[in-house]
Amino acid sequence: MPVERMRMRPWLEEQINSNTIPGLKWLNKEKKIFQIPWMHAARHGWDVEKDAPLFRNWAIHTGKHQPGVDKPDPKTWKANFRCAMNSLPDIEEVKDKSIKKGNNAFRVYRMLPLSERPSKKGKKPKTEKEDKVKHIKQEPVESSLGLSNGVSDLSPEYAVLTSTIKNEVDSTVNIIVVGQSHLDSNIENQEIVTNPPDICQVVEVTTESDEQPVSMSELYPLQISPVSSYAESETTDSVPSDEESAEGRPHWRKRNIEGKQYLSNMGTRGSYLLPGMASFVTSNKPDLQVTIKEESNPVPYNSSWPPFQDLPLSSSMTPASSSSRPDRETRASVIKKTSDITQARVKSC
């Protein structure tokens, strides 16, 4: 292979102008459109002198074939020529004018002028590279200029001082902390925000002189839940009001029946009273069934004691004592049963 050889485009022009290869000719010399015979060896068979003289000449020119030394290989010559034609940037195929079938198959190509030649894919013009390098170099300079413009409004004292920039992840605020050794006591630990964020942030600053925060009891006053209806009914049954207790205290008297003490109100109520239902039935005590027997001869509340004062003592007391005794025994037995069941839970009245 020769060290220096002619490039393919001028070599093709020389071959076309020689008129030594059949089928190779100019179709439009002004537009540089030419025709190359392109036979298919697999279909029609190879005639080296008729179908492959151009491919053979290119193989000899590139040093791939030496006449009289190498065996003829028109198929390889054609493949090498096609690859060389496709790699040229200044020659393109005119596919609408090419005929690829038949005994007279040929291809039409056009040589492009310098103005229409596309640049190579792997290379870029120097101007684009230089512009890109300049653009990359100018970006840090612009950022530093923007930072200096943000501090340019300060006095010359701050401009001379060295500053450190804190870069935080996902931070859009540049914070410049000025050196503390060069500042007075009035401007120590001062932070200058060059680019404040769009969203305002509320920051609470407290000092030692500020008052202590309000206690939790002041922030959340004590609240008492309302009393349920069941509790109200229970309290009304078990706990008397002040007026009732004031009126009823002087009238309560103690009585001893079968070794147990009971209270009775002789002035306004019957002789013996059972404790209220609230004292027997509550939320924390088992449900009990209490039976109260009604008196056969109830005493009116507005009558004086003892009843039937007009009657003789012997006649009036005898039936009353005989009739009231079983009633008293019945009440006492009921109270005794209930007190034995509840024992410690029921307090004595």
UniProtKB/Swiss-Prot annotation:
Acetylated by CBP/ p300 during cell-growth. Acetylation on Lys-75 is required for stimulation of H4 promoter activity. The major sites of sumoylation are Lys-137 and Lys-293. Sumoylation with SUMO1 increases its transcriptional repressor activity on IRF1 and diminishes its ability to activate ISRE and H4 promoter. Residues 314-324 have a biased composition (Low complexity). SUPFAM superfamilies: Winged helix' DNA-binding domain. Residues 117-148, 228-251, 297-349 are annotated as: Disordered. Specifically binds to the upstream regulatory region of type I IFN and IFN-inducible MHC class I genes (the interferon consensus sequence (ICS)) and represses those genes. Also acts as an activator for several genes including H4 and IL7. Constitutively binds to the ISRE promoter to activate IL7. Involved in cell cycle regulation through binding the site II (HiNF-M) promoter region of H4 and activating transcription during cell growth. Antagonizes IRF1 transcriptional activation. CDD domains: IRF. The modification N6-acetyllysine is found at residues 75, 78. Residues 5-113 bind DNA. It is found in: Nucleus. GO terms for cellular component: chromatin; cytosol; focal adhesion; nucleoplasm; nucleus. It comes from Homo sapiens (Human). The modification Phosphoserine is found at residue 225. PANTHER family: INTERFERON REGULATORY FACTOR, INTERFERON REGULATORY FACTOR 2. Interacts with BRD7, IRF2BP1 and IRF2BP2. Interacts with CREBBP in growing cells; the interaction acetylates IRF2 and regulates IRF2-dependent H4 promoter activity. It comes from the Eukaryota. GO terms for molecular function: DNA binding; DNA-binding transcription activator activity, RNA polymerase II-specific; DNA-binding transcription factor activity; DNA-binding transcription factor activity, RNA polymerase II-specific; RNA polymerase II cis-regulatory region sequence-specific DNA binding; RNA polymerase II transcription regulatory region sequence-specific DNA binding; sequence-specific double-stranded DNA binding. InterPro entries: Interferon_reg_fac_CS (IPR019817), Interferon_reg_fact_DNA-bd_dom (IPR001346), IRF1/IRF2 (IPR017431), WH-like_DNA-bd_sf (IPR036388), WH_DNA-bd_sf (IPR036390). The gene is IRF2. The keyword Oxidoreductase does not apply. Its main location: nucleus. Induction: By viruses and IFN. Residues 228-239 have a biased composition (Polar residues). There is a cross-link at residues 137, 166, 293 (Glycyl lysine isopeptide (Lys-Gly) (interchain with G-Cter in SUMO)). GO terms for biological process: cell population proliferation; defense response to virus; immune system process; negative regulation of transcription by RNA polymerase II; positive regulation of transcription by RNA polymerase II; regulation of DNA-templated transcription; regulation of transcription by RNA polymerase II. This is Interferon regulatory factor 2. Changing residue 137 to R: Some loss of sumoylation. Increases IRF2-mediation activation of ISRE and H4 promoters. Increased inhibition of IRF1-mediated transcription. Additional small loss of sumoylation. Great loss of sumoylation. Abolishes sumoylation.
